[in-house]
Amino acid sequence: MSSVFNAQSFLRTVSSSAGVYRMYDVKGDVIYVGKAKDLKKRLSSYFRKNLDNVKTQALVSHIHHIDVTLTHSETDALLLENDYIKQYMPKYNVLLRDDKSYPYILLSQHEHPRLAYHRGPQREKGHYFGPYPNGGAVRESLHLMQKLFPIRQCDDLYYKSRSRPCLQYQLSRCSAPCVGKVSNADYDEQVKLASLFLKGKDQQVISTLVAKMEQAAQQQEYEQAARFRDQIMALRKVAEQQEVSNNKGDMDVIGVHYASGIACFHLLFIREGKIFGSRSYYPSVPAQTDMDEVLRSFILQFYLNADIQRTIPKEVVISHNFEELHELEAAVSIALNKKFSIKTNVRADRASFLRLAVTNATNAVITRLSHKNTVEQRFVLLEEILELSTPIYRMECFDISHTMGESTVASCVVFNREGPHKGEYRRYNIEGITPGDDYAAMKQAITRRFDKIEAGGKIPDILFIDGGLGQLRIAQKIVDEKFVHLDKAPQLIGVAKGEGRKPGLETLILGDTETSFSLEGDSPALHLIQHIRDESHRFAITGHRNRRQKTRNTSTLESIPGIGPKRRKALLQHLGGLQEVKGASVAELVKVPGISIEMAQTIHDALRG
């Protein structure tokens, strides 16, 4: 316990009412938020002699002071606790990092509506279907929709610029409303059917199409009847592949597995009785946290996150029973202003879905533990090979990417003992050097990375340089300069490519002694080095390609007299890209806002010349 904090004096002032407490460290940071029916009783438990919980011991040792907020009821305390956890993100609380907005399928409000992927604020008018658990689920659904319903998926600018059908029409994946290949009535009918399908009413869609097929056959419109028949067969095939519940309602089914410090909540999103999607969540759980706290924290943080656009069903089925379940139901219902039910003992279809969710959660934890153990073993082997006296907690790797000196980008990727730490990745756009000078590029990147480094900052234990002795010397010189007044500096290691750039033939060079050595091709430590090197290369080349494309788009158009940033943007947006601008006729260029007939001719001549 902190010597500054007088627990006995503090406890004499604490009420026995319900409420929330916030524990602070000496820096004034909130390190834990908790709630209690009886604050005095709960807080007293932290300061008993012989605490047997390691987490509690560590927490108490860092307490500098505690703030208390009284509430009218335990339900109010639950809600306030959740608000404080979201606000302060305390290190000793269970934290669910679920800050990405969820993707939707948008059916736009247009004369000829389009289906599109959407993430973010819902500003465009139309109907939004979702949310989907991830972007892959949306793209997969859109791909399926293209096969089932000939509705356009192009953006409005592309739609307006068409003078003839695109490839999607030839593939029977769009009915080409842009050039009048389908009547408005027929297109609207397909839009209605697509909307019903996205709502999960596929049997209603099939029944409608069967009636239309029979009507077309009676009227001897056999080609039309055949198209309806093919559409019905495709829909039935999709319906057969989906697991369907007799219960046609909406619910979330949550399977939970917690082992070796890793908690997984696997959610099945059941909509209209079908599995709409699934997703695994891995909240950050401090060691020896009580399972009830893990469950309570997840439910509150997941369903009461106002920053995430999420459709919340009335019913949630979860694999673990826990205390405060009814209080939790009441708290969420009050916060959402709607009925919210949590069930743990279920039968029939619900039980089947729950078993599936638990199986997925268990497998996910096993996979993570296997990966974690593999990475951990590789770190330990690397420590042994390098004869280090302290563990490696953070590694970084730098790489340079360019095309003949154009659009040079440096990457810095970060690994910890669990593998890639992508939130810490950085790219550096290299400026003001001789094109193709990799040494100067590396010097600029390393300088920018450590320019303002301080003790206690994010200092890597190992810094890999993807390159030979020359680049390593440049990096070592900068590190020596930047860390001269600090107690700790990274160990630099150059990773020189082997003969023919074949994996397993790399030469490793120590930055301080310039000693070179190689590892066996099947060495797990070498595999770790290859992993971080390859990840650095991937991250650098992706950044370089994006920068190069942006530069080429800009320079190609803005080199034309009269074309500035605004007109360049209008051309690219209206026609869909640089290649489309290059292939456009004068008549098509004139349709772009701000482009006169004379300017269109100038652009056409410049790009074709």
UniProtKB/Swiss-Prot annotation:
SMART domains: GIYc, HhH1. Coiled coil: none annotated. Its main location: cytoplasm. Residues 16-94 form the GIY-YIG domain. Transmembrane segments: none annotated. GO terms for molecular function: DNA binding; excinuclease ABC activity. Residues 203-238 form the UVR domain. The keyword Iron-sulfur does not apply. Keywords: Cytoplasm, DNA damage, DNA excision, DNA repair, Excision nuclease, SOS response. GO terms for cellular component: cytoplasm; excinuclease repair complex. It comes from the Bacteria. One of its GO terms (biological process) is nucleotide-excision repair. It is found in: Cytoplasm. The UvrABC repair system catalyzes the recognition and processing of DNA lesions. UvrC both incises the 5' and 3' sides of the lesion. The N-terminal half is responsible for the 3' incision and the C-terminal half is responsible for the 5' incision. Belongs to the UvrC family. Interacts with UvrB in an incision complex. This is UvrABC system protein C.
